[in-house]
Each structure stands twice: as structure tokens, then as C-alpha cells.
Amino acid sequence: MRQIIKYIVLIIMVVVIHYESNGQDSLSYYLEQAALYNPGVKSRYIEYSAALEKVPQASSLTDPELQLGYLLKPMMLLGGNQVASVSVMQMFPWFGTLKASKDEASKMALAKFESFLTAKNELFYNVKSSYYKLYRTIKEIEIAEKNLEILHTLEKLALTKFRTGGTGSSQGMGGQMQSGTNMSSPGSTGMNNSSMSGQSNMGSGSMPSSQGSPAMSPGSGAMNGSMGATGKDDMVNLLRVQIEIHDLENRIALLRDQLVTDKVSFNRFLNRPLSADVFTADSLSQTPIPLNIHELTDSLPNNPMVKMYQAESEANRAKYDMATKMGYPMLGVGLNYMLIQKRDGNTSMMNGKDMKMPMVSLSLPIYRKKYKAMRNEAGLLRDAASQSEIDVLNNLQVNFQQALQNFNDADRRVKLYTGQALLADKSVQLLITSYSSGGADFVEVLRMQQQLLDYQFKQVDAVVDKNTSIARVVYLTGN
């Protein structure tokens, strides 16, 4: 029983470690799954496998020819009567033709392999880019929800000030926040009742008594006017924060819809159900570029697309050599075997003995136009592949420089907005504390809160852009 328990515990530990490793390195896991199951990459690999099958075809001799002949009436020969003949002939191309043909097929298979690597690298870049987009959307939802909590806190503070007429202390407003947590709409009954009661109280307090009441002091009218203005300002502040809340709630809803779309886009690269869950890391490591700039620039020719055109150029060079050698004669070697029947009365020593005749044949390639056209075709295709290689390399250099610029820009923005977000967060906390004690303008609190939200979004965008730029550099250099 103890052994069974040990095995169960061991299995659970292995499973937990497996899932933890997947959680820590989920992107690597998704890249592996994409390489295994993406139909586009599998199609390119199948094409490469099919191209490999052409190599033994190209390096093989043509099939030998077998000829059978039967004489309906035996032919009288000196050594007897010939009744049948059998001949075998094998044609051999000119020296080096098969080697050139094999080289062409091998280089074309290599080009297919480089095409497969290109598709795989492009898939990896798309998976990384889509993964980073998912991460950005998830983080933006988290940031928006945290800022929504801040706005709800500001709403409670504004509602408390509106109820107390702006005269309550911070402790008093803290107690009022608990009782007014449900007052989130300017059209709610509680707020209307409080505003109506406040207005009626102010109105009754400002009306002079007609029966023996003391006379109104000269400053009471100004005080009532300032209290009315303060009440209006507090109500406007409450409406402002509720407008911001509604805008942010709408933005969160939009981000949630975007998250569904991002998952569909990501899952299609893995060829799995589009609604499958995707797990992302809690944070993206800000990985530096792996090599220095000069080494990266020198590695651009290692891009599989460049190597593919190089292989095509070499294949067409071998094809040109093959076309040249195909214009030379083909040599045939064979054997003719004649069946001889004995003839009565023939005293020859060869009477009835079969005859064997070695044969040699030679083709005459006198129609030269087709061989010339084959050479011209191979030469033009070789030049086209060389020009395509140059064009791809030029585009890689431009795209690499653009990716490097994007990386440097994103790296600067990460440092900038990380610091700016910290400063803005401290400013928001200080302004909220100051507003609670009646020392800060509510508009300034909202403005700084919006700036904090903007900095946090930009910081996430910068981190995603930086990692996407690194993935782009890796894709361009073919690593």
C-alpha cells in the first residue's frame, strides 16, 4: 500500500512540475506545438520529402531494352537453321551526365528544405507576435480594471463631498464612503434625495422669518451662495468621474472582445480548436538582442530564403551542365543471342550451335536546337535565382534596420514609461489624499489618473514592441 502511495505522489509531482514548466515557458511549448501541427509547415516538409525522392530517379540509368524475335520459317545459315533471336541493349549517357542530373535534383531538394525552414521561421515569428498581442490585451484588461477601481474610489469621495457639502473632514468622508458605496449613478434616488434635501435646507436656511426672527447677518447671503456653488461643483465632479467610469467600462468590454479575436488568431497557427484557452506568462522578460550589430548583419545571408535562392541557382547551374552533356552521343552496349537448330546433312562443326553477338550503338544528337534551348533555359533560371537572392538580401537589410530601429525605440519607451507610470501612480495617490482633505482640485485628480492609465498602456505596448522586434530580428537572421 505504501508503494502505491509513493507512486501516486511521484506521478502527481511529475505532473505538477510538467505544468509548472509549461506555465513558465509556455511560449516554447506553443512553438513546439505549432511546428508539429501547423498544416502549412507540414505541407512544406512533405514537398521536401517528395523532392528527395527525385534524387535516385535522376541518378539512375534508363531501363535496358529487350528484343525477342521468332522466325515463322527457319532461316538457313551455314551452321544450321536460325529459329529465334534475343537481344539486350543498355544505353549509357555521356560521362558526367548522371552526376549533373543528380546534383540538380539534390540542389532542388535543398531549395525545398530551405523553403520549409522559411515557413517554419515565419510560423515561429507569427506565433510569437500573436502571443505578445494576447499578452498585451490581457495586461491592458488588468490595468483598466485596476484603474476602474481607482475611479470607483474617486466616485465615492466625490459622492461623500457632495453629500456633506464639501465641509467634512477626511475621517468623516471615510465614514460616509461606506454608507454611500451604492451611489454610483447621478440619477440614483439617494443622490436626488440628498441633493433635494440639501437644496431645501439651504433654501429654508436662507429664508427670513416673518415672526420675530432675528435679522439675517450681512455675511449669511454670501455664505449660502458659496455653499450652493460648492454643491454644484461637487455634483459636476461626481458626474465627471461617472463619465470616466462608463468610458473605461466600455473600453474593457472592447478589450475582452479583442481577447477572443486574438485567441482565434493564435490558435489557428497551432491548428487546434479556435476557442482553446491560451496561457500567457505573468510578465515578459525584456530580452536583449542576442548578438552585436555587426554579427547580426553578417548573419543575414544565413536566412533560409537567401539559401533557397542560392540552392536554386546551383541547381540550374547543374542543369546547364546536364543539358550540355545531353547534347553529346549516348553509348549503347548489348548482346544478341541467336538460337540455331541443327540441319540434317550439314557436316559443319558449328551445326546447331547458338550464336552470340556483342553489340555497340551510338546515338546521333544532330537536332541541336532543343539542347541549345535547354542550356538557355537553365542559364536564364540561374540568373533569375541570383537576382532574386540579391533582392531578398537587400530587403532583409532594410527590414533588419527597421527592426533594429523599432527595438531601440521600444527599449527607450520601456525605460521612459516605466518611470513615468511610477511617478504618475505616486501623484495619483497624493492627489487622492489631498482631495480627501479638501486640498486638491478634482479635475486635476482625474487628469492625473487618465495620465497614469495612458502611461501604463504605453509601457505594456513598449514591452510588447520590444519583444516583437527581437522576434523579428531572429526571423530575419535565420536563427
What annotation goes with each model-predicted range?
Residues Q3, K120-L300, N406:
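Periplasmic alpha-helical coiled-coil/stalk elements that build and connect Gram-negative outer-membrane
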Residues S106, M235-I243, N376, F442-Q450:
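Short, charged, amphipathic alpha-helical segments
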Residues Y19-Y70, S87, M91-P93, T97-A100, ...:
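Bacterial Sec-pathway N-terminal export signals of envelope proteins
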Residues M1-V9, I17:
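Bacterial N-terminal signal peptides that target proteins for export
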Residues K42-I46, S59, P93-L123, K307-M308, ...:
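Sec/SRP-type N-terminal targeting helices
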Residues P288, I293-K342, K356:
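Acidic, glycine-rich loop-and-beta core segments that form the ion-binding/anion-interacting portion
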Residues Q67-S101, M177-M227, D282-P290, G334-I366, ...:
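Small/polar, glycine/serine/threonine/aspartate-rich low-complexity segments that form flexible
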Residues H152, N192-N193, G198-S200, N250-R272, ...:
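Short segments within alpha-helical structural elements
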